[in-house]
Structures are given as structure tokens and as C-alpha cells.
């Protein structure tokens, strides 16, 4: 085992860490790995180039999008996912759904102590294979768009939720509850008035995305989408919302596309908390192999694993490569 630790000191939950955080992590890892800092995603290429192929495990210590960027940098360098290192999220983001799914416990120092002990004992931690989404498309300037990810909020409520979520300086589980509570209160007080110029929290959140959507060759019978999402596995968002229950079994993708009224969305909140599928006459909430999204007017700004990408006019979503995640549990990350 050899550990490659990639630290983003600018991530929200790392900003308050001691100035010598990376030095502390290097002391934990010792001779069993390397710790590198990135000032931006532009630094990832050089860092991964130094770590691969020596590193058997790539540890992502950053914010919500850090693991996604690390996986995609590896994907851009090595086509065969079987040759990729094992990835390790460190619960450094605000939503942490990949770590929850893989049952990774603890923060970066505890996780690195467990991994270093495993390396010293020559007993690598157990691993779990997670499904991914592969997203291919086109931008407004005609460029090719290509990403690997686990969860997609291409438009509608799921996408606009993150606008409100990231307005908070320190978002987390409580922020999710506050966004939902304010949207419900605003909708109850004022409703959603089409074309109104009055600022309205609920109106922004419930504004639909206009697009032509085709799932497995069948067009969704509406161009108005308040739900436009995809998941490679069931997601526990901040320990509060349980999304994409139809993707709970390996190999099953969960697609959501279509329209649900704001009142219908609010009525379905208990189902989202409990991890149940949602229903609607103009909604497709199903398993599938491929979803194609073509915008009608405004480009998409999809959220992929908590990271926003602007200016997408066409997006094709299907199964991506399976990825190995090391399971560092509470019994070892202490």
C-alpha cells in the first residue's frame, strides 16, 4: 500500500483547520505515502501525475466536489478503470453521500491513521465497488462535455436547491432543513406566481427547467421539468434526504424527469425523507439505461456530486465505470 493524499486547504471545512494541517497529515502518513496540496482544480493534473501509478489509494481531503474532480482527473489519464487506484473520501464535504454509501467513517486524520496502520500490517482495508454515471454532452460554444459522477441534478428543484444551500457559509444537515422549511413557508404564504417580479424564495426553487427529455427511447410527455435528476446509487443527502431509492441495487440507474406541482413536491417530502419513490401524472421516476436531455431555451447548469457546470445544451446520461472505494469504518478510524 502507498497513500496519495490530495488536500484542498480552501475547502469550506478545511479553512478553519490549523495552518500546519498538511504537515500533521504528513506526520501521520510517514513513509507510507505523500500529501499534496492543491490551490485549484488546475493543480490536480500535476499532483495525480506525481502520485500515479505508485499510489494504491488516492485520498480526497476537500469539499463536496473534491472526489469528483479527483476521479475525473484519473479518468482523463487512464482509460481502464481497473488500473485506477482505490479512492478514499474523507467526509470533508458538507453532504458526504459517497462516504456514507461506502461506510467510510471519521475525518481525514482518523482515516489516514487507519490506512497507515493497514499499510504497516500489509492488510489493505476492504473495498466496495460503486456504480457511476457517465455524462456526455455539448456546451453552448460547441465544446464536448464529459464527466463521471454519482448523482446528477440537471435542472428543476434538485438543481435550484443547491443555489440556496450554498448561500450558507457553513452548509450542512441543518441547512437542508432550513431551505426546505423556508420554501414551504414562502409557498404557503405567497404561492408561486408565474411571471411575477417580486423576489420569492419558493418561486426560484420551484421554477421548472424546459427541455426535451428521452429515457430509453421514449420521450417524457412534457417539456417542463421540476424534476430532472439521475443517480447511480441510493443517496443519503446530509443524513436528511434519501434520494434515488430505485438505484439501491448494483447496476440500477434511477432517472427522474417531468413535472410535479410545487404542492405535489411538498406533499412528497415524507417520501424523500423515508427513501421512497415519488409519483406524478407527468413524471417519469424509473430505472433506465439512458437519459438524453436537450434544452429548449436556457442552457443547463447541472450539479454533479455537488459541483456546478455551466453552459450545457445537450446531455446524455448512462452507466459509467464502477469505482473502488476503501471502507474505513468506525472500528478502524478511531
Identify the role of each PLM range:
Residues 50-54, 143-145, 220-223, 285-287:
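Flexible, charged surface loops at secondary-structure boundaries
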Residues 1-61, 65-68, 72-77, 82, ...:
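ATP/NTP phosphate-donor binding region
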Residues 5, 215-222, 232, 238-334:
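ATP/nucleoside-binding phosphotransfer catalytic cores, i.e., glycine-rich phosphate-binding loops
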Residues 38, 81-224:
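Catalytic core of DAGKc-family lipid kinases
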Residues 16, 69-71, 98-100, 239-240:
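Short glycine-/acidic-enriched loop or helix-start segments at secondary-structure transitions
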Residues 12-16, 160, 236-239:
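Short N-terminal binding/cap micro-motifs at the start of the first secondary-structure element
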Amino acid at each position: 500500500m502507498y497513500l496519495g493524499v490530495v488536500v484542498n486547504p480552501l475547502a469550506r471545512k478545511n479553512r478553519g483547520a490549523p495552518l500546519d494541517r498538511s504537515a500533521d497529515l504528513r506526520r501521520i502518513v510517514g513513509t507510507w505515502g505523500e500529501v499534496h496540496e492543491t490551490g485549484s482544480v488546475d493543480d490536480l493534473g500535476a499532483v495525480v501525475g506525481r502520485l500515479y501509478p505508485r499510489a494504491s489509494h488516492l485520498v480526497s481531503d476537500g469539499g463536496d466536489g473534491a472526489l469528483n474532480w479527483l476521479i475525473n482527473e484519473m479518468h482523463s489519464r487512464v482509460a481502464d478503470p481497473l488500473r485506477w487506484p482505490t479512492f478514499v473520501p474523507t467526509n470533508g464535504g458538507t453532504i458526504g453521500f459517497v462516504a456514507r454509501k461506502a461506510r467510510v467513517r471519521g475525518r481525514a486524520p482518523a482515516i489516514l491513521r487507519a490506512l497507515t496502520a493497514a499499510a504497516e500490517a500489509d492488510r489493505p482495508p476492504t473495498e466496495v465497488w460503486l456504480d457511476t454515471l457517465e455524462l456526455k454532452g455539448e456546451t453552448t460554444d460547441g465544446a464536448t462535455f464529459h464527466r463521471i459522477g454519482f448523482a446528477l441534478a440537471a435542472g428543476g428543484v434538485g438543481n435550484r436547491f443547491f443555489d440556496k444551500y450554498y448561500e450558507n457559509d457553513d452548509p450542512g444537515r441543518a441547512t437542508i432543513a432550513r431551505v426546505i422549511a423556508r420554501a414551504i413557508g414562502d409557498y404557503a404564504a405567497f404561492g408561486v406566481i408565474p411571471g411575477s417580479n417580486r423576489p420569492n424564495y419558493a418561486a426560484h426553487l420551484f421554477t421548472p427547467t424546459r427541455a426535451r427529455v428521452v429515457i430509453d427511447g421514449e420521450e417524457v410527455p412534457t417539456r417542463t421539468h421540476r424534476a430532472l435528476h439521475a443517480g447511480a446509487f441510493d443517496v443519503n443527502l446530509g443524513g436528511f434526504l434519501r434520494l434515488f431509492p430505485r438505484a439501491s441495487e448494483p447496476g440500477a440507474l434511477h432517472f427522474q424527469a417531468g413535472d410535479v406541482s410545487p404542492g405535489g413536491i411538498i406533499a412528497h417530502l415524507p417520501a424523500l425523507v423515508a427513501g421512497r419513490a415519488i409519483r406524478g401524472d407527468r413524471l417519469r421516476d424509473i430505472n433506465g439505461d439512458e437519459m438524453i436531455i436537450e434544452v429548449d431555451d436556457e442552457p443547463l447548469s447541472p450539479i454533479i456530486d455537488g459541483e456546478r457546470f455551466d453552459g450545457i445544451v445537450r446531455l446524455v446520461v448512462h452507466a459509467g465505470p464502477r469505482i473502488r472505494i476503501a471502507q474505513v469504518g468506525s472500528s478502524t478510524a478511531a
